[in-house]
């Protein structure tokens, strides 16, 4: 199996995660600014200045929008994955990882519902938990939501099994169950684990709870795919396409890491719909 495929998968996952995490935080802060909550966006959390503006109406909309955004982006990126030609291997696996990460973040918010405890500055990963608390849902209902999210993770693993295998270089290799399992293991699971380590080391020193929840969700999806890949699956590949190392992906990852580390170390402020600031002096 071509090692370039594994490297490209690691890079694609890291780029996808960093990109969608930023969009997730930005959408929450943008919604909060619309309701006059005066948010300040940090690398690892969002602070709100106008606490008197929190109402049940505002809470539901501010903390629902990021989860819905994750799901919508996941669907959009999956459609892009389906439209990209097979010869553009890196773009295909990048869009596929973006779709998977969108689902991971959406299901992570559902899974975290029972573990929510109110805090003045609730972090984004328990966004649905905030809404559940304000709607006074009982603990049994919250656990039902979490259980439903686990079922969706397994279903997601089944759905993405076929899509993961469509990134293989040769259709003849996919006829063997052992190759399919090795492909999921080396091109999906290993890059996922290494990509999460890279993301954690780069950007989230104070956001470990979020990463743990996302890590569990993604791991369950991929392990489900690994199990389902043992079945006989006919994967449609129009022709064999060797994988080459993507310098575009590596460049994108480098730019994103530099973007995050620069903002985290020095801080950048600008005026818009909300005050946008990232700095390392603020602990959330």
Task: Locate the predicted segments by residue.
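Final/C-terminal transmembrane alpha-helix of multipass membrane proteins
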Residues: 11-16, 20, 243-269
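Hydrophobic alpha-helical membrane-insertion segments
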Residues: 13-26, 96-112, 257
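Membrane-helix interface motif
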Residues: 30-40, 107-126, 264-273
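Metalloprotease/metallohydrolase-associated module, dominated by Zn2+-dependent proteases
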Residues: 52-165, 182-196, 221-224
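Juxtamembrane "helix-exit" motif on the non-cytosolic side of transmembrane helices
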Residues: 83-84, 110-113, 195-208, 230-234, ...
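Membrane-interfacial, low-structure loops and terminal tails that flank and connect transmembrane helices
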Residues: 92, 164-185, 234-244
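Transmembrane alpha-helical segments of integral membrane proteins
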Residues: 222-236
């Amino acid at each position: 199996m071509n090692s370039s495929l594994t490297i490209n998968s690691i890079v694609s996952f890291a780029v996808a995660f960093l990109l969608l995490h930023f969009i997730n935080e930005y959408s929450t802060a943008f919604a909060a600014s619309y309701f006059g909550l005066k948010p300040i966006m940090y690398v690892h959390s969002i602070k709100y200045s106008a606490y008197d503006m929190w109402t049940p109406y505002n809470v539901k909309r501010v903390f629902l929008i990021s989860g819905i955004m994750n799901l919508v982006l996941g669907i959009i990126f999956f459609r892009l994955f389906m439209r990209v030609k097979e010869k553009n291997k890196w773009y295909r696996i990048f869009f596929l990882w973006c779709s998977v990460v969108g689902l991971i973040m959406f299901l992570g918010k559902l899974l975290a519902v029972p573990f929510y405890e109110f805090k003045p500055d609730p972090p984004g990963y328990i966004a649905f938990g905030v809404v559940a608390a304000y709607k006074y849902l009982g603990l049994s209902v919250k656990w039902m939501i979490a259980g439903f999210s686990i079922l969706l993770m397994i279903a997601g693993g089944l759905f993405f099994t076929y899509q993961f295998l469509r990134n293989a270089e040769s259709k003849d290799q996919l006829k063997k169950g052992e190759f399919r399992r090795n492909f999921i293991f080396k091109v999906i699971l290993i890059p996922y684990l290494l990509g999460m380590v890279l993301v954690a080391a780069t950007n989230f020193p104070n956001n470990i709870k979020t990463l743990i929840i996302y890590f569990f969700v993604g791991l369950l999806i991929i392990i489900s795919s690994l199990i389902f890949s043992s079945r006989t699956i006919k994967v449609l590949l129009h022709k064999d396409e060797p994988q080459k190392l993507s310098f575009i992906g590596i460049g994108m990852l480098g730019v994103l890491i530099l973007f995050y580390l620069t903002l985290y170390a020095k801080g950048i402020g600008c005026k818009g719909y909300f005050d946008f600031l990232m700095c390392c002096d603020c602990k959330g």
